[in-house]
């Protein structure tokens, strides 16, 4: 009798897990992901995430929703306007801190995966200007105090905020730059290269992949250099903004003569903390198991690994994501 009871219990447990797995595999999800403008990398990532979810759960789909970008996506996901959202690490850091442009901390977002962390801040300076003032890195810029015309991106853009924090790491403000006889120009990234080429600025800072066509284009018009951050400054900026310390490799551009230390923007896939643990688990699982669907959307995504997906530290991972990452040994 005892043996029969144990056998029956064993069969029940096995049957339970088989049934649970079958239910999970047969689950169909209809989700929305909010990204940025159509045609950009984030729309491609949205398509890759859709493909991964379809592969893991046939009959499912993820609809891509355009938006104003990561700052807007914080509000959309936190208010339940979409199940999934893509947000830059620096935007997410500002959100959880309640720093500009947010009026108060956003506390109900959770991470599913780090999607990339290789969009480095590249401080590009006209080489003729650099030679005139003996500038090779940001420390030189601060020491020499030249009348530099610095394009920092538009107001409200987080790249502009990172440029501000880079200067701040050396004890310098925008007002200090102006006191040197310089200017701070709020020029969009698509304008910066043209402005450098036609002599309207001496320097710009942008967070884009390396190499990037806008920087290559500018370097064909005027000779340029890239300014390096010190170890201490890069760590200060990383701690303040949520960006990651990063090295731009010498081979990224023909005119670079060494590796350049900086910080990099990244993008994270986030959800509302009200999402069920099982849904978050299933999404995380299928993204890792079908990672090639995301790697294949653009050549810049080929470096994506499961280890990287589990490596962000700006906000907490969703409990469902944690459960999966622990199961496969990606986090302890």
Regions found by a protein language model. Name each.
Residues 108-156:
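A conserved helix-loop-strand patch within extracytoplasmic ligand-binding domains
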Residues 170, 198, 203, 208-220, ...:
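An extracytoplasmic/periplasmic, membrane-proximal ligand-sensing/linker region
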Residues 22-33, 105, 139-149, 319, ...:
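Immediate post-signal peptide segment of exported/extracytoplasmic ligand-binding proteins
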Residues 89-91, 99-100, 107, 111-113, ...:
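Pocket-lining segment of extracytoplasmic ligand-binding domains
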Residues 29-49, 69, 155-159:
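Extracytoplasmic "Venus flytrap"
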């Amino acid at each position: 009798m005892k043996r029969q009871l144990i056998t029956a219990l064993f069969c029940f447990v096995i049957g339970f897990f088989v049934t649970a797995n079958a239910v999970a595999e047969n689950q169909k999800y209809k989700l929305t992901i909010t990204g940025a403008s159509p045609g950009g990398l984030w729309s491609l990532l949205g398509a890759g995430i859709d493909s991964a979810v379809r592969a893991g759960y046939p009959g499912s789909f993820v609809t891509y929703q355009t938006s104003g970008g990561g700052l807007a996506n914080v509000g959309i996901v936190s208010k339940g306007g979409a199940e999934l959202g893509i947000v830059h690490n620096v935007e997410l850091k500002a959100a959880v801190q309640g720093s500009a442009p947010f009026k108060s901390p956003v506390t109900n977002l959770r991470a599913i995966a780090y999607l990339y962390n290789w969009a480095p801040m590249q401080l590009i300076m006209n080489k003729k200007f650099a030679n005139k003032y003996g500038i090779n890195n940001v420390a030189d810029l601060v020491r020499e105090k030249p009348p530099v015309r610095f394009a920092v991106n538009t107001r409200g853009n987080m790249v502009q905020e990172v440029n501000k924090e880079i200067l701040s790491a050396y004890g310098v403000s925008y007002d200090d730059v102006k006191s040197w006889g310089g200017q701070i120009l709020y020029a969009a990234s698509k304008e910066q290269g043209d402005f450098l080429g036609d002599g309207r600025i001496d320097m710009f800072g942008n967070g884009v992949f390396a190499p990037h066509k806008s920087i290559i284009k500018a370097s064909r018009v005027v000779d340029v250099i890239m300014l390096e951050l010190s170890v201490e400054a890069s760590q200060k900026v990383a701690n303040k903004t949520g960006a990651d310390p990063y090295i731009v490799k010498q081979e990224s551009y023909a005119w670079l003569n060494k590796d350049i230390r900086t910080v990099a923007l990244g993008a994270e896939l986030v959800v509302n903390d009200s999402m069920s643990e099982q849904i978050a688990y299933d999404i995380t699982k299928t993204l890792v198991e079908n990672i090639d669907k995301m790697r294949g959307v653009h050549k810049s995504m080929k470096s994506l690994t499961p280890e990287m997906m589990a490596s962000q530290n700006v906000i907490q991972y969703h409990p469902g994501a944690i459960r999966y990452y622990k199961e496969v040994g990606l986090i302890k």
